[in-house]
C-alpha cells in the first residue's frame, strides 16, 4: 500500500517543496514504474438502500453537469470546459422542457472538474482532427442521455481503503468489492480511481504505479502471419515449430434474438426509450459485454505468450481493407485488431511495412511467384517447384525479411529502397544462379550506401 501522508489543514504549506516533491515523484515513476489499471467489481448483493441511491444519483448528476457544460458552451463566447465546477446547483430539464434547479448531493467538485477536463480533451481532439483532415465538418459535442463513468482524483482524499472495502467521497458507507487480491503487489502506489457503470454491474477501476517487471526472454524469434481462415499462423525460427491459432467468438442465440426484437421495434418506429426498449437495450449490452470479455481474455493470454520471445515479427496488415472486401464478419468475431494494437506497443516487436510481398518470395532460391492468388492455400516456387503451406511460408518469410532489413544501413530502410533491393537481388540471382545467395545480398547492400564501413561485420544470412 502507499505511504502517502498529507499535511493537516492547520499547518502552513510549503508550495515550493510540494512542487519539487511532485517533480521528483513523477521522474521516479517514469523511470522505475509501470502504470496499471486494476478493475474491482462492487458486490451488488451487499448494497443497502443508501449505497444504491448513491450509485444511481452520482451518474444522474454527472449527466446533468455534462449537459450543462455543453449548454454553457453553446452560448457565444463561452467554452464548455470552462463551466463553473464549484457551483453547488445545476439546471436540468424535465420531459416537458421545464427547467429544474437541483443541488449536488453525490458528485463532488473534484469529479466535476474532471468532467471539465474530459470535455476539454474532446474539444482539442475535434480541433486537431479538423486541422489534419480526418473529419471535414462537425457540430461539436452534443447532449448525452447517460454518463457511465465518474472520476475520483486523489487517493486518501476523494477515495480510500477501509479495510478490504473502498470508501468514495460523498458516500457514508464503504463498498465491498471483488478482486481486492489484485492490489497485493509489493511497492504499489495508488493514483486515481474511476467509478464505472456497465451492463454487468458497477466497477471501480484503480490506477496504480507498480515496479517494472523484467521479462526473461527465451532468445527466440517468432514470425506471425495474420489471416481470416486461420487467425494467426506462427513460426519459431530456432525450433522450426509452427502453429495455427483460430479465434472466433460467435453471437449467442440470446444476443441474436434480442437484436431481432430491437430491429423489429425500430422498423415499426417504436421508441427504444420506453421501459421495454430500455430493458431490451440493457440485455443486448450485457450479452455484448460478455462476448467482449471473452475476446479480451483470449487476447491477454496470447500477448502474454508472445512477450517471452526475444523478437516478434509481423506485418502491418490492412485490416480495414479486409473488412471492406467481404471479411467483415470474420474480423468482427475475431481478435485480429486487438492483438495487433497491443503487440505493436511491445518493446520486442518489429513491424514490417504493409506492402512487402511476404507470401510471394521463396528465400532459398530467391525467386518470386507472381501468379499466387489470395485464395490459394499452397505456395509453389516457380524455380525449384517446392510446395509449402502458404501461411507457414509467409510467417517464415517475415523472419527472413526482418533479418534482411537489419543488414541494411539505417538510412536506407525506407520501403522504396527495400523494394529496389529485392528486385536487384532477384536480377543478380537470375544472372548468376551459382553464386552464393549470402554473397549476392552483401554486394547489393554495400551498393545502397556510400559508407561501406556501415556494412562491416554484417550478420550472416
Walk through the language-model features, giving the residues of each.
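Long, hydrophobic, amphipathic alpha-helical segments used as structural scaffolds
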Residues: 70-77, 123-134, 210
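Short amphipathic alpha-helical coiled-coil/interface segments
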Residues: 59-62, 115-123, 280-291
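Catalytic micro-motifs at enzyme active sites that drive phosphoryl/nucleotidyl and oxygen chemistry
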Residues: 28, 190-194, 207-214
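Positively charged, helix-rich recognition surfaces that bind polyanionic ligands
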Residues: 3-9, 200, 204-461
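Gly/serine-rich nucleotide phosphate-binding loop at the start of the catalytic core
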Residues: 2-114, 460
